[in-house]
Amino acid sequence: MKIAIMNCLNHNTRCAGAACLNAMNRRIRSFECYKDTELELVAMGRCNGCEAGMDAGMREKLERLVQEGAEVVHFGICTKNKEGAECPLISRSAEYLEQHGVKVVRGTH
């Protein structure tokens, strides 16, 4: 199964992506449903930041995920604020992906 992981650009200053990759590789937390499934990570990316919003570059990233055949995109826990509300850009990105036949999972580790 081809999957991708998307994270928050603002959190990138302190995140190496190790916890997301660890959860995927060990098939724990949001990746537990794949415990008997071979996974291919086709992309690991970030949004373009709050200020950029759904700009041409972000749309290009999402289109690329579809072109690469991503069947599922996991949005990292960093795409929600402390209260648990999802970033509006991530919500729009998820909607775009779902409209193009890509399953969206909110969560990684």
What are these regions (language model features)?
Residues F31, M44, K82-H109:
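Short acidic, glycine/proline-enriched helix-loop-strand junctions
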Residues C8-L9, R46-C47, I77-C78, G107-H109:
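Fold-independent oxyanion-binding glycine-rich loops
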Residues N25-R29, R64-E68, E95-E98:
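Short, surface-exposed linear patches
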Residues L39, E68, H100-V102:
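A structural motif corresponding to the C-terminal end of an alpha-helix
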Residues M54-C87:
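Mid-chain, well-packed structural core segment of small domains
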Residues M1-L62, E86:
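Conserved mixed alpha/beta catalytic, RNA-binding, or beta-rich assembly cores of soluble enzyme
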